[in-house]
Curated annotation (Swiss-Prot):
E.C. code: 2.3.1.-
Example of a GO MF term: DNA binding
Keywords attached to this entry: Activator, Acyltransferase, DNA-binding, Membrane, Transcription, Transcription regulation, Transferase, Transmembrane, Transmembrane helix
Family in the record: Belongs to the camello family.
Gene Ontology, cellular component aspect: membrane
Pfam families in the record: Acetyltransf_1 (PF00583)
InterPro entries (UniProt xref): Acyl_CoA_acyltransferase (IPR016181), GNAT_dom (IPR000182), NAT_camello-type (IPR050769)
Location of this chain's protein in the cell: Membrane
Transmembrane parts of this sequence: 57-77
Functional note: Probable acetyltransferase.
All copies of domain N-acetyltransferase, residue ranges: 55-206
Protein name, per record: Probable N-acetyltransferase 14
Enzyme's top EC category: transferase
Amino acid sequence: MAPSHLSVREMREDEKPLVLEMLKAGVKDTENRVALHALTRPPALLLLAAASSGLRFVLASFALALLLPVFLAVAAMKLGLRARWGSLPPPGGLGGPWVAVRGSGDVCGVLALAPGSSAGDGARVTRLSVSRWHRRRGVGRRLLAFAESRARAWAGGMGEPRARLVVPVAVAAWGVAGMLEGCGYQAEGSWGCMGYTLVREFSKEL
């Protein structure tokens, strides 16, 4: 499917369940890889080993003492990712959420935006997900182009001296990172845990 066969419009109320499932599926595709990346860093391994050693004095089962800290850490990380990216955001100053729709009416992607935390920060993508059945068909690029146009219009309406768009990407989402770099975005920051990156932020001056 070529990008020209796509349109982007605001999400309708009856599309909420479908869009929510799409967001959850998108998070599920990356959460295991993010958890594996985070929990195999040396500081995380040291903390897990210390927790397991402590639990051995409390629990009768060596296997349970070994696995329980890992299970709890993975569960906490997955819940955090789902809360951040796997739910519908509240309506923001930039409108939306928006959906990408095929000519047949099938919803194949979702996008949400929010203003930056301070003046000059530009706009931020808070949700960007494409149905697994429609990936590598230009849907992500079409949504990104729409996000850029909204960010420009919002910056002009707010009297901002420049338009800028920031897109956070989970460290394991190599496909999204490659798409952004191909569209002129540059990695400018990151955040994570214990000094290790879990999410990179890409930005572009529009």
